[in-house]
């Protein structure tokens, strides 16, 4: 089991979540028709697989990942591929389910996958990483943030880990004096949510605010939050921290409005996507804050070029998951070129070379400048704070 490496967050916090295969007809046909690129002239290609939810309650995440991965693969191939070899990419739906994610992994293995970019959400990612460890296959998850998701030595991530999200959130709330009394509503049956809560609670003691209510729910009780909200309201919570996914968060905001409770709401990367929830009154998310490494309205040239191309291709604004994924594919390219790997190498030999290369590269991407990785797979980069203003994500 890897040791968790702390991220250097303090400087950024002065300014400034998640993861089956279903090889259904729709998933397979999408992968076959839209997500495979032409092989190199000699027939040798790198085969990179992806896994995530493109149906179900977390589909906003998986769809963004699938889109951005293909964008990156198209760029890689247009620029000459990896070490002169073109890349084939195939994505499998896992519906944010661990068992289906393992099935998806097996489907991709049968296809000939040599490296895995995935999975998208934490619980499925943890299940799949146990399988990639058995096969010694290189794995880079864009967004699987649970500590356990990259426990094996072959697994790395682009996003922040859950513990670091919890610590960073508590620091931001405390340093910016957002509230004296804070409530937390979290999913005790989910490793992403409970992991963030635990380190948030620990760091809160150092930040000068009090957690006046810590209310849990489970996968079996995630449609009615009236009890948790009532306890937060009665405790006088001025801010409610929600280390959860956007679907449940949209229900909480709706129910809080119904009961006349109007605290500040604060989330992490799993909140990204709440403006796209079907039938949700997005005005209820006004002034909601979250920590994320990517803000689509940032004015730097790299972000604007990515957002413009993504909007043109998919008629949508990319979220953090899309940005993490675009970076992930280019990170794979950079590490593979550093390692000098070729498609004729075994999966295990590719993995061993990639593991070393990941600790030697420095990557400038959409989600961080001068990103580096330790041998335990953790990235060193810094988060940003984002607020929903006038129905749009806005950098703080």
What are these regions (language model features)?
Residues 40-42, 49-70, 92-98, 120-121, ...:
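Extracytoplasmic "Venus flytrap"
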Residues 253-326, 387-389, 393-394:
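Extracellular/periplasmic periplasmic-binding protein-like sensory domains
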Residues 60-67, 82-149, 217-225, 250, ...:
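Beta-alpha junction/loop-to-helix N-cap segments that form part of ligand/metal-binding clefts
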Residues 17-34:
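Bacterial lipoprotein signal-peptidase II cleavage site
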